Curated annotation (Swiss-Prot):
Glycosylation sites: 165, 474
Species in which this protein is naturally found: Penicillium brasilianum
EC number: 1.-.-.-
Gene responsible for this protein: prhN
Transmembrane segments: 14-30
UniProt name for this protein: Cytochrome P450 monooxygenase prhN
Described function: Cytochrome P450 monooxygenase; part of the gene cluster that mediates the biosynthesis of paraherquonin, a meroterpenoid with a unique, highly congested hexacyclic molecular architecture. The first step of the pathway is the synthesis of 3,5-dimethylorsellinic acid (DMOA) by the polyketide synthase prhL.
GO BP terms, alphabetized: mycotoxin biosynthetic process; terpenoid biosynthetic process
Lineage: Eukaryota, Fungi, Dikarya, Ascomycota, Pezizomycotina
Family statement drawn from the similarity comment of this UniProt entry: Belongs to the cytochrome P450 family.
Amino acid sequence: MLSILFDDPARTSSGALLIVGILLLRWALWPAPSSHWPLVNGKRWFEITTTKSKDRFVANGKDILLSSFKRLSKGFRLGTDNGPMIILSPEYVDEFRSEDRLCPVKFQAELAHTHLPGFEILSDKHVPKSVFTDFILRKLTPAIDSTAPASVTRLREALESTWTNSSEWHQIDLHSSVQVLSHTTTSPIFVGPELSSSKAWEELTYRYVGNFPVVACSLRLWPKFSQRFVNMILPSCTSLRKDVNQARQMVNEVLQKRAASQAARISQGLEPEKFSDGLQWWQELSGPPCDPACLQLALIFSAVHSTVDLLSQTILNLAERPELVDELRQEIIAVRESQPWGKAAFYKLGLMDSVLKETQRLKPVSIATEDVTFSDGLVIPKGSLVMMSCHNMREDSVTYPNPLEFDGHRFRKMRESPTNGAMAHLVSSSQHHMGFGIGTHSCPGRFFIAAGLKLTLSQILLNYDLRLSDPSENVTQNQGLFLMPNFKAKVEVRRREPEIEL
């Protein structure tokens, strides 16, 4: 039929209209897998597309969510900027935590186009989840103690270049400077001395990590059937592909040079040179094949996006609270004078841990790989995008007295509780706080991220004073369901004389 319609130019227009008509009919009559769940923010009667409803979600997502749970306590469908999602009540967290059929990896693949060239760093094919998790748990986390001293030196140099040594109050670019600090603490550990000292590698990773989420979001605006074609012609997508290919060339060149050097040393009867970085650790792992360049970009992407938001918001919160900064400085000095930086020292930074956990606002998301039926009969259809609501983190006055008030001591005091003490740590997860995910869906890199955050924040607080240029300015902003740092808020800093050298 298609050949009859399109072989004759005179019929092309009517053929196109017929195809569009068939597609619209299918869209209208074929129910989505989760369509029996009530949609709380669909199109209004005079709206043809979902554009306006998505705009309303981005502007008022939090209010829509809270009002909807008052009517539909177990959950509902919410039209988001990423398409319709099932929003579950936190009451299902115990079943959610161990449900393998709710798969965050597939959700990630759905939103990040990981099947397309340029986006493959988050693909399970190029970076298998088992290899990624094994790398973090067996190599990265155990290296926290050994890598801390060098990270301190690099942080000091990065702060001097971005925040300067001026003892006068001056404004900083919070977002870009925190990105620099995040790269500073991770890049040498991930890729070793050859690439971490390369300006080309630094520029590539900054560019790629910054562009990836923006380009992925823009590609989602196109119909799914057209995305593979659009990916090949959109300049921003082309740029991502070029960066991935360049990363492969650079990583492979380092690996080849190391292999040649090691072979030469062995032939001369010398001990092979020992490397302690991600490029070496990757080669020591067993498991399915893994693209080493994609692994490196995935590590950097995950670390930067996990760190920048939380560290930026913490700095904004502390800039409003000089008395809390003084308490944190006293804690840092007491801990550092008693022992060197490492996991044991970071554990003792209880107040800092509490401040970071109080600041944290992240959410776990998944996709159902099969129909999932919970114990009360609630069904999640296969193919549904699912989000576990964390609104109780800000609304639960039983667990969190005065829940809307920032209390830097909240989780430090909770540590002393015989019933809730175990869930009070930054890296802990529970029904009441899912900042790093929950159960089998928890972030495997949370211990490494927490250590890096505490090391960076210690360096900042001992060496700089903080304040907001305009104390009346909001330090957070809502975007859809998420509470984001307000990067338009102007932060000022000045160099101070540290009580001790870290």
